[in-house]
């Protein structure tokens, strides 16, 4: 397995174009088991031998309502997390939006910014530019960032509703 965060440019094959769906299914699965990952980020998805993704690093996860001090890397962190006492499923969904953005664009959000600059950008709703994405992908990512999804099943429904051509639009990879 290799770490997806080391990827630069990907070929648009079936395995890679399905990564956003695979990432969402992984999050949906852990949420269905009462687990909140608390550190969803491209750095915690591994590429298996067959090209599919595996979610990793559950060290800071919340299980069945336990509290976690883990909050993920700054650019994956939901802006309202500071107001909450601990990470929730909503934090994982916000972070999923960043993961999808990074998979689809091949760009890491907020490169070169300090943690405090990232926090200020997120708190003021200055998210990465979605122009490189199709309208359907922009909508899904923006809904993650705007906390419009109640659960991962809703994200899956939107992903499953994408047209075949939108699912196969260019993707960046290793």
Language-model region placement:
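AlphaC helix of the protein kinase catalytic domain
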Residues: 2-11
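Activation segment signature within eukaryotic-like protein kinase domains
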Residues: 19-20
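Catalytic-loop of the protein kinase fold
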Residues: 27-48
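Activation segment/activation loop of eukaryotic-type protein kinase catalytic domains
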Residues: 43-84
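Conserved catalytic-loop aspartate of Hanks-type protein kinases
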Residues: 92
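Short, conserved alpha-helix in the C-lobe of eukaryotic-like protein kinase catalytic domains
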Residues: 96-106
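Helical subdomain adjoining the active site within ATP-dependent kinase catalytic cores
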Residues: 106-174
